[in-house]
Amino acid sequence: YQSTNLPTMHPDDRILVAIMNSRRDWALVQDEGWYRLPTKHAPPDAPHFEWLAFYFTKVFKDDKWAIHYYARIEGHELVTRRDLIPSEPDHPRAGQWYYKLQIGPLEHKLPPIVSLRGRRVTFILTTGDRFMNALEINDLFEQESPAGQVYVRLKELGIPVEREWWIDEEGIAYVVDLALPIEDGWLPVTFGDRPSPAGGLRFAAEAEPDACMREVQARLPAT
């Protein structure tokens, strides 16, 4: 399900990165050219995106934790799961609503966009320019906010850092803007009113990146 006559991705195109954690669903993408997006969990602006990319989870073994394929979205329908998979009319979610995203030929992302650590990912919204230039999943997020600028500076210094990282604290899971691996776990960094775990760093939403960098570096082990 690939072609040499492929559409062009533009810098400001909107791209949805979706989680692919089922080989059966991937077979449907390859063989039938559509992907189902549950409306109750759909990200903002759904289904109005130009492109769909797929983040493979651990079920894909050697290809796990990476984006290897993407495709142009050519249309969408609002349907129930029963309409999509009529062979399972009694499935518990048979009556739930989905966007059926109809896609064009699959394109191979080379090199793939990888996650340097196995990570939990929900939907990621990004743009054409970020997608085409990204080498790792963290590069897909915006880089203009204070959090984005701090990420870029840390990366330029060769300091490992993750963006939009899930923290699980006593059974409660939430996302922090930045997370830096340290000897005894993670140093979480949040901006604005996002939850901040004990021992983490919190900055104002419009904090000065230079000041943030000084505080972050002060918390890191000396090298």
PLM segments and residue spans:
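Active-site beta-strand-loop-beta-strand hairpin of nuclease catalytic cores
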Residues: 173-197
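Structured alpha/beta reader/binder surfaces that contact nucleic acids or chromatin modification marks
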Residues: 8-173, 181, 206, 210-214, ...
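Compositionally biased, intrinsically disordered low-complexity segments enriched in Pro/Arg/Gln/His
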Residues: 3-7
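Residues at the C-termini of beta-strands that transition into short coil/loop
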Residues: 192, 204-207
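Active-site regions of enzymes building and remodeling cell-envelope glycoconjugates
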Residues: 197-204
